[in-house]
Amino acid sequence: MSGISSKGLEELKNNGWLILEDGKKIKKEFKFKDFKQSIDFLKDIQPSADALDHHPDVCIYYNRVIVELTTHDMGGLTDLDYKLAIKIDELYKMKTSNL
């Protein structure tokens, strides 16, 4: 398992991910119409997280979903965080393209 390249980090930042804790964690807030859409989004994330065996920390505040990613056992960011972040962004674009 390797870390995220500087190019990968730059891509994530350009997509709205915040780099936290000196590059050990990434975080992004996703906004929806209502609570149901927030919950549905989390359900959409679950299969991808399971497929990668890499699960985000998530907080839901009615119509907002805050996702944080880090690889706890590596003490920072890895390619798993990058892959899941990119997938989450794709899912969000698909979910919100009809709003």
UniProtKB/Swiss-Prot annotation:
Keywords: Lyase
Catalyses which reaction(s): (4aS,6R)-4a-hydroxy-L-erythro-5,6,7,8-tetrahydrobiopterin = (6R)-L-erythro-6,7-dihydrobiopterin + H2O
Record-annotated disulphide pairs: none
Any one GO molecular function term: 4-alpha-hydroxytetrahydrobiopterin dehydratase activity
Pfam families per the UniProt record, alphabetical: Pterin_4a (PF01329)
Matching CDD domains: PCD_DCoH
Enzyme class: lyase
SUPFAM superfamilies: PCD-like (SSF55248)
Lipid biosynthesis keyword on record: no
EC number from the UniProt entry: 4.2.1.96
One of the GO biological process terms: tetrahydrobiopterin biosynthetic process
Entry's family note: Belongs to the pterin-4-alpha-carbinolamine dehydratase family.
PANTHER family: PTERIN-4-ALPHA-CARBINOLAMINE DEHYDRATASE
This protein's name: Putative pterin-4-alpha-carbinolamine dehydratase
